[in-house]
Amino acid sequence: VGANLQQVGEACAAGMFDLLEATVEKFQRASQTLKYAQVPTVAAVQGMALGGGCEFVMHASKRVMALESYVGLVEAGVGLIPAGGGCKEFAVRAADWAAQSATPGEVFNYLQPVFMTIAMAKVAKSAVEVVDFGFAKPSDTILFNANELLFVAIKEARALADAGYAPPPMARSIPVAGKNGIATFEMMLVN
């Protein structure tokens, strides 16, 4: 689970915006460090991974999840935008999904469902939904027996390392939907 949202609200009310910005920047650096580490990072997920916890899960090289896992970016439920890198990671994934489709230049159709996932603060209620919602990838591992979680996560990390793991290249440009997409998303929020 991520930041204490009550403390965030109190800091906002007190006008402590410099502290909030510094905290968010540190969290974003931590997320990026997970994603671009020179060694594989494997998230072992059981129970809840909400808010910042979800963002760390999204940035891992691989995820091993107990079937009974609850994962989501819940910040919008209290009027905040997730700021630890989850929104960016969803945009990167939407661009990847579009690039693999028949219409690689049209990213909007892939951004729309993840936008709704973020805006509605949807929480996946099983590891299968975690993949369906896009918080995890189809290649990630789902376990029925949660007692095997740590063993399998370590095994996956070793397998990635033995295969010569290299971090993904840094995303330099992420295609987005532009002004028309922003207008459509704003309309979706109002309706």
Question: For each of these PLM feature ranges, what is it?
Answer:
Residues 32-78:
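Glycine-rich beta-to-alpha active-site loop
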Residues 4, 56-57, 130:
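Hydrophobic/aromatic residues within transmembrane alpha-helices
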Residues 5, 27-36:
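Acidic/glycine-enriched connector segments
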Residues 61-83, 134-149:
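Gly/Pro- and small hydrophobic-enriched strand-loop and loop-to-helix capping segments
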